[in-house]
């Protein structure tokens, strides 16, 4: 089993036990140990008051070395867990906290192999969707640039981003794309080609079209 969980004494108080969950191989254990477990156990101020107060202090930056998000649904929590985050569960509370502790093992940005450019930038998209969206934002710094995340695949839970310029992209087209993404009902997405089959029309043209 690669799923792991362990008890944490909040602020060193055995009466306030929390549960930390993560998937082995998906997290950097030194980050979990140094930036989550140790501060939670050693910061005695976190044990003062009730758990709701501790949640607020942790969410607002008590563990300042990590980004933290509050999750209120099981789908959000599971999505973060399989993405390399660790989850901190509080007994009797309906929320959990998600910490970014991923391994961050990914291919570096490099020149495209299939379509090498003759002029201009020589960086290409990689397997990390966050890296790809950051590449777009570096090249297109307009405040109108919008990035919306959708999740496709019942089993793979693959993130897919809709990126467009607000005020320039046709709102109806953006809406149709998002509706089609949300309507895709498959187990998993292996490549962008899988999405293209569901998003484009079957008209006789060499170019993919939105119906």
Regions found by a protein language model. Name each.
Residues 1-211:
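Cytosolic regulatory modules rich in charged/polar residues
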């Amino acid at each position: 089993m690669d799923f792991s969980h362990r008890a944490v004494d909040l602020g060193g108080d055995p009466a306030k036990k929390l549960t930390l969950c993560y998937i082995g191989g998906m997290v950097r254990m030194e980050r979990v140990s140094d930036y989550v477990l140790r501060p939670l156990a050693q910061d005695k101020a976190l044990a003062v008051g009730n758990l709701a107060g501790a949640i607020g202090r942790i969410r607002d930056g008590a563990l300042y070395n990590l980004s933290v998000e509050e999750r209120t649904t099981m789908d959000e929590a599971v999505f973060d867990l399989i993405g390399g985050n660790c989850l901190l569960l509080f007994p009797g509370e309906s929320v959990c906290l998600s910490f970014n502790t991923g391994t961050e093992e990914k291919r570096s940005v490099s020149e495209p192999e299939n379509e090498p450019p003759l002029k201009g930038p020589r960086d290409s998209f990689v397997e990390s969707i966050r890296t790809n969206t950051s590449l777009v934002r570096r090249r297109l710094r307009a405040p109108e640039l919008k990035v919306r995340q959708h999740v496709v695949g019942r089993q793979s839970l693959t993130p897919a981003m809709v990126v467009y310029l607000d005020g320039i992209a046709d709102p109806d087209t953006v809406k149709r794309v998002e509706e089609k993404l949300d309507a895709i009902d498959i187990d998993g997405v292996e490549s962008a080609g899988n999405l293209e089959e569901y998003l484009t029309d079957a008209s006789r043209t060499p170019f993919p079209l939105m119906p």
